[in-house]
Structure formats: structure tokens, C-alpha cells
């Protein structure tokens, strides 16, 4: 009987520990979602010039007269089996002090040389934004590139995370020392954002992606940090397909 009671106590204790750990994981997942909602609730930002009037979190790094700068980026990377990793994307900085935006569109093809070292061949095309339109600041002879810039849309302009709270069972990671945190979810091809990506990019796989929400800074938003979104369709040696997007607020550099 003693042995049975001891076993029952041990099992009860084990169940309690598992419940506490699971509860902590669920609580941290909710905190991470809440942290991202502060940024993702702005999506879709159809007119990027609206960011000139949106305030982000300010800490003591900001000068009192600095209204801050929003940096927005989107990038698609595709590597078919045995080929180079082809990357196309854009970065745009929207300065709230000057109400002006400039950045660059870029293309890159990364392949390894005979010694296995990656060779980076990124080409950048400077751009600016006027009346919510992206315009090259230098003459571009390549008509295909010109068209890509003309038609480019940032993920923040069409992405929608109104159903973020419905994502369940995420793989949660949290390091309070850094602090950095992330939540990863397996999506389906019926997900709204997945459909939008397939509509805009020639994605060479029917596999549904995993969504990674990765951030830095205090979870309660009381510090400056980044918020990164990544959709990974394929991830293996010599073959990759992923999309990344970012939107963050930081002090301006008006030099």
C-alpha cells in the first residue's frame, strides 16, 4: 500500500510539473502574440505615407526633437535544387522629421565557389517614394528591373494578421537575457497571407510554409527592438524558399 501511495504521489507531482510548464508556455505564447499585435495591428498599411503620422515606441536613445524613422523591408529568396540562392527585395526608410522616404531595391544571386565559400553578388538600385509610389532615383536600363520596382509592394501593404490569436500550438522560444523571443506555426495553403504570397511570387513548391514571428526587446514593448516575420516553404541543404518582412521604428539619422 505504501508503494502504491508513493507511486500515486509521484504521478500527481509529475502531472503538476507538466501542467505548470505547459501553462508557462501558453502564457509566454500569449505575451509574444500581444507584443507582435502592436505592430501587426497596423497591417495592411495600403498607403505607406500614413507611417509619417504614426508614432512608434521611443526610449532614451531618441532626441526630444526627433520624430523617428520607420524602416520597412520585404524579401523573397528562392533556391532551386543545385542552383544559386536568388534574392529580391526592397528596404525603405520613412523619415518622420522630413516626411521623405528613400531606400533601395536589390537583387542577389548567392552561390558557392570551388572552395565552398558563398559568393555574394548583390546589386542595389536606389529608390524614393513620392505619393505612395516607389520611383528609381537613377536611370535603369533593365526594363525587367524597372517593372519589378514599379510593381513592388511591401508585405505590410497587403499582409493581414487579424486571425493571429487563432494560431495555436506554436513552438515558443524566449531568452529573457538578450531579450529575444519567437513563435513558430505550421500554416496551411488556405491561410490568407500564404495566398497573398503565392499570388505575388512564383513559389516553386506546393508545400505550406511555417510562420516564424521573431522579435527582440522587452515583451511589454518598453524598449526598442525589431519585429521580423518569416514564411519558410522549403529549408534544406541546397534548396530553400523563404520570405521575410520587417517593420521597425528607430531614431533618425538626418545627416
Swiss-Prot record:
Keyword tRNA-binding assigned: no
Lipid-binding residues (covalent, S-diacylglycerol cysteine): 24
Extent of the signal sequence: 1-23
Cellular component, GO, one term: plasma membrane
Record keywords, A-Z: Cell membrane, Lipoprotein, Membrane, Palmitate, Signal
InterPro entries the record matches: Csa, Csa_sf
Bilayer topology annotation: Lipid-anchor
Coiled coil segments of this chain: none
N-palmitoyl cysteine lipid sites: 24
Subcellular location: Cell membrane
Family: Belongs to the staphylococcal tandem lipoprotein family.
Name under which the protein is recorded: Uncharacterized lipoprotein SA0094
Species name: Staphylococcus aureus (strain N315)
Amino acid at each position: 500500500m505504501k508503494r502504491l501511495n508513493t507511486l500515486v504521489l509521484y504521478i500527481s507531482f509529475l502531472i503538476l510539473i507538466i501542467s505548470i510548464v505547459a501553462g508557462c508556455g501558453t502564457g509566454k505564447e500569449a505575451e509574444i502574440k500581444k507584443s507582435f499585435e502592436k505592430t501587426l495591428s497596423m497591417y495592411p498599411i495600403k498607403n505607406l505615407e500614413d507611417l509619417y503620422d504614426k508614432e512608434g515606441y521611443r526610449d532614451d536613445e531618441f532626441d526630444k526633437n526627433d520624430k523617428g524613422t520607420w524602416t520597412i523591408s520585404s524579401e523573397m529568396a528562392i533556391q532551386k535544387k543545385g542552383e544559386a540562392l536568388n534574392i529580391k527585395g526592397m528596404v525603405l526608410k520613412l523619415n518622420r522629421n522630413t516626411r521623405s522616404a528613400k531606400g533601395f531595391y536589390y537583387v542577389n544571386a548567392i552561390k558557392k565557389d570551388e572552395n565552398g565559400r558563398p559568393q555574394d553578388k548583390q546589386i542595389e538600385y536606389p529608390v524614393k517614394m513620392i505619393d505612395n509610389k516607389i520611383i528609381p532615383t537613377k536611370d535603369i536600363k533593365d526594363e525587367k528591373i524597372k517593372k519589378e520596382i514599379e510593381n513592388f509592394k511591401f508585405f505590410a501593404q497587403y499582409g493581414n494578421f487579424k486571425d493571429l490569436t487563432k494560431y495555436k500550438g506554436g513552438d515558443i522560444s524566449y531568452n529573457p537575457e538578450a531579450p529575444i523571443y519567437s513563435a513558430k506555426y505550421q500554416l496551411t495553403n488556405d491561410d490568407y497571407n500564404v495566398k497573398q504570397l503565392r499570388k505575388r511570387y512564383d513559389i516553386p513548391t506546393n508545400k505550406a510554409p511555417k510562420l516564424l514571428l521573431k522579435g527582440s526587446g522587452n515583451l511589454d514593448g518598453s524598449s526598442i527592438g525589431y519585429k521580423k516575420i518569416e514564411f519558410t516553404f522549403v529549408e534544406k541543404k541546397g534548396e530553400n524558399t523563404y520570405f521575410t518582412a520587417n517593420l521597425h521604428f528607430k531614431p533618425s539619422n538626418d545627416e
